[in-house]
């Protein structure tokens, strides 16, 4: 009995230390969030240059696998700061997605494939509808995901929605067990985003994410925010338009 109690105490202590480490590792100051977004932007641009100009550089492709998970984590943290997801913020995402779609097509992507801003909009809309616990809104959320699925081939598909949902729930979790379970889900879903491309892409996405988060968590804690609120969607649409024009 004493041995069992000792083992239980040790397990609880390990779980507590892991939870404390997790919170220090994944909760960032406004400046740290902007650093992570900047790294993600650089990785995204490298990936898009490689794809749009057909450079076929493996290192650029692999580096780009870290962009979406980093954006997703920052998005989840930002969203969790409010008691409820705000519909006006979701509406802005829908609007920017529509604007960016023209640049997405100009950059050479199929017109019927939704850009990544739509993935964020769909995820936020589904989450807010599910939080209301209304039957018709739950049905609407399921319908929205079903409609998005065939249109999301270049934006991580349903796995991308899962990544966004897990990122949000991780920061909303109120107890240790839920946080640790969601961490396990996160470590599984990040490689799953790129598993269809190759094993190397799956590993690269996880490595780039963990490496970036680890380095940023150790520095910049007192750095204030330096990007304006809508910088990412504006930059996303503009960089696609510029690359699309240059590739003509």
Swiss-Prot record:
Membrane topology, from the record = Multi-pass membrane protein
- Tell whether Cell membrane is among the UniProt keywords: yes
Which domain of life does the UniProt lineage start with?
Bacteria
Subcellular location(s) of the protein: Cell membrane
Q: Which UniProt keywords apply?
A: Cell membrane, Membrane, Plasmid, Transmembrane, Transmembrane helix
**Which Pfam family, just one, is annotated for this protein?**
TraX
Q: Where is it mostly found? A: membrane
Q: Which InterPro entries does this UniProt record tie to the protein?
A: TraX, TraX_Ftype
Its transmembrane ranges are 39-55, 180-196, 200-216, 232-248
* GO cellular component labels: plasma membrane
Q: What does this protein do?
A: Responsible for the N-terminal acetylation of F pilin.
**To which protein family does this belong?**
Belongs to the TraX family.
Protein name as annotated: Protein TraX
Organism taxonomic ancestry = Bacteria, Pseudomonadati, Pseudomonadota, Gammaproteobacteria, Enterobacterales
